[in-house]
Amino acid sequence: MPHDPSFAPTQLAARAAYLLRGNDLGAMTTAAPLLYPHMWSWDAAFVAIGLAPLSVERAVVELDTLLSAQWSNGMIPHIVFANGVDGYFPGPARWACSTLSADAPRTHQTSGIMQPPVHAIAVQRILDHARTRGRSTRAVAESFLDRRWDALVAWHRWLAECRDQNDNGRVTIYHGWESGMDNSPRWDSAYANVIPGDVPEYQRQDNKINTDASQRPSDLEYDRYLWLVEEMKAARYDDELLPKAVSFAVEDVFVSAILSVACQVLAEIGEDHKQPDADVKDLYSWAQRFRTGVITTSDERTGAARDYDVRADRWIATETVAQFAPLLCGGLPHDRERALLRLLEGPRFCGHPDLAYALVPSTSPVSRDFRPREYWRGPVWPVMTWLFSWCFARRGWAERSAILRREGLRQASDGTFAEYYEPFTGEPLGSMQQSWTAAAVLDWLG
């Protein structure tokens, strides 16, 4: 797809739909055709959101495929590997999940970690679209909910029980990949304390596909990423052993906010569709617990949220998109929330005078950690724009939501459907033809 900055909404929607069809392997959609040729967990949820206005039935298939690879302990793995597809590292042999863990599925090859739990939002969007269709389409969506309700609750229960063992109301991650924000400055200090041992030899694939080194993590960073995988493998991915076995452990405030929102959304779905009262009660309880956990981290003056390094026993305060986690789940005192909104909309983030679009950069342009081309250290991610816009609409902030949608569509109108964008120039970066970027556009255009 050649770069063209002038696609009208109807053209853009058609191109986005064409992209998703092109990335469709039948029962799963690749995150991107070259760099990410498999199914990623939170990508799949966003893909389902984009598929829903095109075909509720196909959106259901996407989530069905993902949930069919769920571990028996409830975890949804961050990658479900497509059969017969190579070209990605680390692949299933490196993870060795089915060999090491009794919880891993035997019918699918997966990774051994998770990603942010946005899936309930996808279920909500599928049900929203199904309500506007015929009876048979509504039946497909409702049948999916009945069939997968237990799996969805088990996923949230696993996060609440196995990843918040101290009841702090915050999800502990054991790898930066679990955050979805792989190389964010949020993890710099925690990764600095990861001392790689004897990492088995490996060949990266990502920097062969995207050859601009300024856009990808370094080899030293990859050594640390892979050493953490080795530590998890040594613990056989056991939920009881990971807290002691892995040298990276951080309470992730952004994932915690997403979990709070997801539990609230799923509880409301459960009430509307007469699911078991005990499940609904648990979901509401978890939503409140993680909302409180997020709010507890916030700065009293600015409202900015912080992560917590469990290994170093200290708070991590960074000028990244994650500090706005309380705006997703709510719960801040009014004055503190207004202060956090001023920070978001001011010159340190969306109001920075040099931004091409008034969107949230992954790291503040005024931070010393800011790198405008490098992954989660500066670029603007359309999928983050979508998430903030959706959460703001849910919270009743219609104008703020509409501004993000408008600016997000302006950015995406180049038609590249890039993974992320340079915040000052608007240059598309990372993987092109990224499925979740197309999905965001399709949901915005409805």
Task: Outline where the language-model segments fall.
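Core register positions within helices of long alpha-helical scaffolds
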Residues: 50, 122-125, 129, 262-265, ...
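Internal, well-ordered domain-core segments that constitute the primary functional module
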Residues: 115-191
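TPR repeat positional signature
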Residues: 44, 48, 116, 120-123, ...
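Long, repeat-rich segments with strong aromatic
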Residues: 245-289, 370, 374-399
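Alpha-helical support elements that line or immediately flank enzyme active sites
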Residues: 44-74, 322-333, 385-401, 405
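Extended glycan-interaction surfaces of carbohydrate-active proteins
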Residues: 2-38, 66-106, 170-250, 289-380, ...
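Hydrophobic/aromatic-rich effector regions of fungal transcription factors
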Residues: 100-132, 387-391
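Extended, well-ordered alpha-helical scaffold segments
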Residues: 5-15, 55-68, 134-160, 262, ...
